[in-house]
Design a protein with these regions (language model features):
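Transmembrane-helix motif of ABC transporter permease domains
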Residues: 10-19, 52-77, 81-104, 124-143
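Membrane-helix interface motif
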Residues: 26-43, 104-119
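Cytoplasmic membrane-interface regions of multi-pass membrane proteins
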Residues: 1-5, 32-47, 73-88
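N-terminal secretory/membrane targeting signals
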Residues: 1-4, 8-30
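Internal transmembrane helix-loop-helix hairpins in multi-pass membrane proteins, together
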Residues: 42-48, 120-128
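Intrinsically disordered, low-complexity segments enriched in small/polar residues
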Residues: 25-34, 50, 59-62
Length: 143
């Protein structure tokens, strides 16, 4: 299956591993901070769903798109293949969606702490938390 779906699977996966390693090392070694400083992105991201369109995330989306685009362009030129869009770009999309779902989990966990603190305060101290405060916390999560 790999031979029919991916262009030259051996060199393809080796180059994908090396390219991903270079991209991760660049981002983690300061390239990510450099890019964020370049666009004057704030270090803090919102707790709400707005974090996914904050400048920090938009910079990472652009970085990922450029990395995938350059890798795909190389393979589209080096070894044109009938399934190249599905194999190269489809795999990149699967990886991105997996990362994004993990980030959704992180966002939900970041929201849990203040929300459940409010619930606990409402349960331990009657009439200290108004229904508006509760709805406001839910509204914060929804963006």
């Amino acid at each position: 299956m790999f031979k029919s779906f991916f262009p030259k699977p051996g060199p393809f996966f080796l180059s994908a591993f090396i390219w991903a390693l270079i991209a991760v090392i660049f981002w983690q070694a300061g390239g990510g901070s450099w890019l964020l400083n370049l666009v004057h992105a704030s270090k803090d991201v919102p707790i709400s769903a707005a974090r996914f369109w904050s400048l920090n995330y938009l910079v990472f989306y652009a970085f990922y798109a450029v990395c995938v685009g350059l890798f795909a362009l190389y393979w589209f030129v080096r070894s044109p293949h009938r399934w190249q869009y599905w194999s190269v770009l489809g795999t990149a999309l699967i990886i991105f969606v997996t990362w994004f779902l993990v980030e959704v989990g992180v966002a939900v966990n970041a929201w849990y702490a203040p929300f459940w603190d409010l619930i606990q305060q409402a349960l331990t101290s009657p009439n200290k938390v108004s229904i508006n405060q509760l709805y406001q916390e839910v509204g914060i999560f929804l963006g």
